[in-house]
Amino acid sequence: MADFSPRFLACLPFVLKEEGGYSNTPGDHGGATNFGIIQAEYNSFRHFAGLPVQSVKLITKDEYRAIYWASYWNPHCPDLSPGLDLSFFNIAVNGGPVRAVKILQQVVGVSVDGEPHLNDVGAAAWSSVMYTSLIAYGAPF
């Protein structure tokens, strides 16, 4: 298993509180979901790990933590300040990492393309302006 960072482990309970457990709501384009992980993503994870496909309803703590770490935390959150990392992580799990980047770009007022350009806005913008803007946007901390 991955060697998770202290910040990831500190933020994880907040995201899990939002994500809850298993759901398969009619009309939800993601279909069957458990801990915010859709069936297709779980299938890919298990295939890559050399494991047989099974229902996302059976996902283990080790599996969802590994998916959160690799797909939602590690690509961008280590570069963000505390608080902002949690908000970004939560948005990424709820709507995908590209959507999370677009929301951050939108609130800062830079070109919205879904590709993170931290140097475009500078560390101060990502840590203070975005933190304040995300609070106004209604993002949880």
Short names for language-model regions:
Residues M1-F141:
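Cell-wall polysaccharide-cleaving catalytic domain and substrate-binding groove, primarily
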